[in-house]
Amino acid sequence: LSPSESCVYVAKDGALSSALVEQTGGISVDENELKQYLETAVIHFNEEKGAGALAQNQKNAERLPAALKSVKAGKDTVTAIFDYASFEDLKAFGETNDNEDTSNSLTALEAKPLSEAIADGWFSEGELVKADGSEAGTDTVQNEKSGMAVRSEGGATLMVGGKVLYRSSNTELKDDSTVSLPETGTAYVIFKR
């Protein structure tokens, strides 16, 4: 994950991350100080959620509600990437006083294998288009065996862990794996995993 703008990321296995990308306007930012500040914010959040006083996920351990994956301070840009145990954790962490990420207004986000999303009745006739915006028939979508489906409500830039195959007509394709989600209504993105 190397985003050029703030986004929410859904991996091929459905795991959730977010990236906070901010322009510094040429102001120098100390990477170590930023990392320390963000680690403290993550630890505080995790403690409030009843998890350990940790800032990073540990191997072979349960995922923390929030984890700081990486921090990078460049000449003009700072980037922080966070991992989450659930969408509820992503949303709650975004609402803390320690988090300056206002890049998304998501109120719901769920990811699951396409076969499960179809079985659960996520899609109705005419809701989906191919990545390029052309019409996608329901049969075409149902024949896609290896896809991952994302359903969301609220605005955001959504980056996914594979090539976008289908999307709601109310979304905008930004590149092969990035979609702009609308502020209102339910949006769907199906990507190859």
Describe the residue ranges of each PLM region.
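Mature, soluble, non-transmembrane domains
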Residues: A61-R193
